[in-house]
């Protein structure tokens, strides 16, 4: 008969094995920009919200800043289903989809294309699984859609002279949540198979150790960068012509900076106080995240004046003009 001590020994052994398995199979670093970077991106963007947008958002800077790291709070192994489902939301390996241009705007069409590619690939077909490729632009556009829908509801409630406190809370949540992904995409290592150590031909001798990702976005940013360092780089928002296409262009631009991260690491740029070159690079990447976030908020607000709920009657030129007039009125409240 097993004793209590032997059962306890086996139980502890099982816990150790489980933790080892988790560490072995964890494929991606736990966060982008760390808690500080994501908080700073959201704060800087919120402080730049124009007066043409609702006043309650301009008063919610602290709440929006707090929500910057929120999706990283969903990545604990103690909430397995949550962690597992949203792990691919934080990255996209653009090298794996270089054959697919343009990327489809819909998540499920993207899945279909990947599975077709996987079926036709003999060598490492699982590289084309959606969870391996990453789904970063799709979650971003889905949260953007939630924000736009909430803005639309806010407009309708205001026009009907009904309370708006509940939808204001939803808008703040979606705005902060969206900020996380806009920030992720500004970190070049979230766009590449070289996300945590150089892979492939390496004539320049870049690091292959699995630590560059966290050293860059975590301890280095926390110790050396503050929101005020990059806030002046963020300008007034601009309306995006095509949010999805513009966001993909932003991701691709970020991916062009991957080698620069490795060059800076090789030069000791992320050790201790780092180097002036690393500081300049990092502040510009954080500013790019805040600028993109601000542009997304602004575009969602403007588009919500035109967007209609499902089964709504078509909008005429007259009602569209009326909506634009209401938009200017609502912004001051």
Language model region names:
Residues 1-9:
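N-terminal secretory signal peptides that target proteins for export/translocation
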Residues 4-5, 19-20, 35:
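Absolute N-terminal positional cue centered near the fourth residue
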Residues 8, 13, 42, 186:
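Alpha-helical and His/Cys-centered functional microenvironments
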Residues 8, 20, 168-169:
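Intrinsically disordered, low-complexity segments enriched in polar/charged residues with Gly/Pro
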Residues 13-26:
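Bacterial N-terminal signal peptides
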Residues 26-175, 191-287, 291-333:
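N-terminal, motif-rich segments that launch catalysis or mediate targeting to/interaction with membranes
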Residues 171-185:
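Short alpha-helix carrying the canonical HExxH Zn2+-binding catalytic motif
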